[in-house]
């Protein structure tokens, strides 16, 4: 998706075609990308005034998707620096014309990067589509597109997974893409060339062109390809259903497994957080993070290590967005915690020029959740077993564990007394934003940050 290696002239010419930047009412060709880089080429009239809703309809017709897919997918404008989901009323052409202004406002791009960057249109999952409804989809092509997007995010590291979960997902991907397991056809040698499309590359370390090995749950050495092959063998098949129905079942199984990840279906934003002071010189710094926001909550992910730093559902947090004069935009997350056994409130500062976007999305998701059905996890069978499994994973230092020791937070207690740090000045309490089970915290008289 990064076209930085192309010249500005050729990149712009390509952009005029693929991203709807044109003027006039004559017919124009538009290229829209799917998450797997498949393209949809459309010829549309009045490109400069066409809405995302109208373009969405043309894409559904081209893909032969049912009308129900209108809620499942959305049009996005994507570049390496910014991702924007378009509302149905948005006009993609006009948003594209404003792209450089958006980059200047919501990113830290250099002037040269802003001038060179061009977005493209992508058809992908709507972040406001509930997971519960996703598992009720019966249309195979719709399920396929959702599967492709989930798999892409797993392989790309946007959805960090434990090795065991990646093995299971890799086995399901083998079944979906290679057909039912056949011991004569499917061997480690046939799986090896496909590993990059089955297993996240960041979990694989190549040596002399071959994948190294890791210890599985039994402690013995097993190659990546053999481990994926073993999970492929274990994929359950039903002789009572057709291959078409079996494919649908396996798509749902893959998606259902991804639903266990708190950041499934999220919009992702760039930010940095303070590191705790370390070492003899008590040095600190900042850590690049991805902030993932969906209908259920907010997750802060270490972009380098590919694991959660903290994940909170909306009832567990309060938030605010501040932009002090001549200072950075900050998204504040407030949540319960403890300091050496003392219950405290914790404040996490996320520095990001996209803090305004994040705050607005959090507010909208909370409002939406108050008017719609409960999150999908409440409807999944065996939910108590899932909760038990999640607890077990966290005890084993899963990528899903909260890692508070890697975060530098401001801690304080309800009477305003500081625990090493004190509450910063604010004009309003976090708790005016939403009703939670937290008690309002009284500010200290002379708050300062250390």
From Swiss-Prot:
TM spans (from-to): none
GO biological process: positive regulation of tumor necrosis factor production
Annotated InterPro entries: Band_41_domain, FERM/acyl-CoA-bd_prot_sf, FERM_2, FERM_central, FERM_domain, KRIT1/FRMD8, PH-like_dom_sf
Subcellular location: Cytoplasm, Cytosol; Cell membrane
Domain of life: Eukaryota
Entry-linked SUPFAM superfamilies: Second domain of FERM
Keywords assigned: Cell membrane, Cytoplasm, Membrane
Domain FERM per the UniProt entry, residue ranges: 28-373
Gene Ontology cellular component list: cytoskeleton; cytosol; plasma membrane
Major subcellular location class: cytoplasm
Free-text function comment from the UniProt entry: Promotes the cell surface stability of RHBDF1 and RHBDF2 and prevents their degradation via the endolysosomal pathway. By acting on RHBDF proteins, involved in ADAM17-mediated ligand shedding. May negatively regulate Wnt signaling.
The protein's name: FERM domain-containing protein 8
Species name: Xenopus tropicalis (Western clawed frog)
UniProt gene name: frmd8
